[in-house]
Amino acid sequence: MLDLQPSDRRHGAPSSSGGVSGGDELIRTYKGWKGNNVFFLGGRLVFGPDARSILITVFLITAPVIVFCIFVGRKFIDDFPHHRGVSVLAVAVGLILLDLVFLLLTSARDPGIIPRNLYPPEPESNEGNGEPRLAHTPQSRLPRTKDMIVNGITVKIKYCDTCMLYRPPRASHCSICNNCVEKFDHHCPWLGQCIGLRNYRFYFMFVLCSTLLCIYVHVFCWIYVKRIMDSENINIWKSFLKTPASIALIIYTFICVWFVGGLTCFHLYLMSTNQSTYENFRYRYDRHENPFNKGIVGNFMEVFCTNVAVSQNSFREKVSKEPAIPPRTVNGGMSSPSLQKVSNDIEMGRKPVWHETVEEELGDIEKDMEAGVASRDLSRMLPPEESEGRGIMHSRESSRGRGIMHSRESSRGRRGGSWELSSRVNEDLRTRDESVSRVGEDSSESSDNDASRDLHVEIYDAVTSRGRTGTGIGRL
């Protein structure tokens, strides 16, 4: 069974030494948060990135109730003895206050965010499979999924590249909030927040209260229309003209109740089967047994009768402003810089750009080749007899090294196949021909001189043909 204990290398977690180093600047965790959340009151309230949509939701709830209380509910005060008609207004106000409280509890709390790791987990060792490993081999690729046993049923858990962790069962990564959320249900655009383990019950109560509020306003608007019909002995159409506010509320609540009422029934079904909206839409348990199903009673008790899970994040805790990522070791050796750079890119929420690493490696190779080309001048320091014997060989090696180098330099920073090498190659060949001619004059072997000239022509033809075909290092 796979162990999923929380890692001590999570973002914002204190170090094992008891805190951060004394020289680092300390900030609150929420100020350096890498997700897209919006924080208020010093990190005490946690909203999603689209928190402004809450204002629209509040308006759609409160505006109809205000209209109801002014134009409809107030008319019922004198219709009951001992001013019992005030209870009509009191119930409406109570429902809307309860609805707004559940809205705040849903949208302003941590939905169950899983803290992200500072770097990827250690790869599984190959011990026991007979495959030898070198001390400085590159870091192996992490498997995309792993198996975990839940109530005797195998469940696959996935690796999150952004958070650099294996997500627990039923968790998923929200692309809007940029967080992994435990028991992820969905991201609600009306509340601007993810719905997960820590706020699902409050979300359901919010939807239920909204449904009851719509039904309540809808019913009492019809009662008020009926009261006008009976008191003035007119038909329903004329009564509508007497109270246009009631007609508007009847139409509005009728439309809304189809949405919030249908949502309430849908989540009642999900709770009875212990599913999430995300799991239901993916048809995850259509052909497989649900390992989390505890029966109807057990499922409802799990939602409403259990303690709210403690948040894994301390948003007000002081941490280092930019925590340094310690270098990884692979079997006792330090990891390569390219792997460390990829880890940093993932931690910053950015996909690794592989061509940057390639350009760095090409830069190192280019420096080595420059050093190799510069060594041709050492022949001038040799004794005359050795210089004469090695002149032709040295010119050949120099022409090869510089030919490759020029092709790389001319292609650097270009995307197409236009190399434009002719002018630079001609100049280099002219310089080398002069050098070879001097060596040929000192040497009695004229045949070697002719062979060297033929070699330069072949190099020129090969380089220009590579430029026309668009192949070579420049195509990287």
Curated annotation (Swiss-Prot):
What ranges does the record give for the region Disordered, renumbered to this chain? 1-21, 119-138, 320-340, 373-454
Q: How does it sit in the membrane?
A: Multi-pass membrane protein
> Which keywords has UniProt assigned to this entry?
Acyltransferase, Cell membrane, Lipoprotein, Membrane, Palmitate, Phosphoprotein, Transferase, Transmembrane, Transmembrane helix
- Active-site residues are 188
The UniProt regions of compositional bias labelled Basic and acidic residues, in chain numbering, are 1-11, 387-412, 425-441
Ranges for domain DHHC: 158-208
Any Pfam family hit? DHHC
Against InterPro entries, the record matches this protein to: Palmitoyltrfase_DHHC, PFA4/ZDH16/20/ERF2-like
Q: What is its EC number?
A: 2.3.1.225
Q: Which positions does the record annotate as the modified residue Phosphoserine?
A: 336, 418
Q: Which reactions are catalysed by this chain? A: L-cysteinyl-[protein] + hexadecanoyl-CoA = S-hexadecanoyl-L-cysteinyl-[protein] + CoA
Please tell me whether the keyword Heme is annotated for this protein: no
Give the transmembrane region(s).
53-73, 85-105, 209-223, 246-266
- Cellular compartment(s): Cell membrane
GO CC terms in record:
plasma membrane
Q: What class of enzyme is it?
A: transferase
Q: Name one GO molecular function term.
A: protein-cysteine S-palmitoyltransferase activity
Q: Which family does it belong to?
A: Belongs to the DHHC palmitoyltransferase family.
Q: What is known of its domains?
A: The DHHC domain is required for palmitoyltransferase activity.
Function noted in UniProt: Palmitoyl acyltransferase.
Recorded protein name is Probable protein S-acyltransferase 5
Organism of origin: Arabidopsis thaliana (Mouse-ear cress)
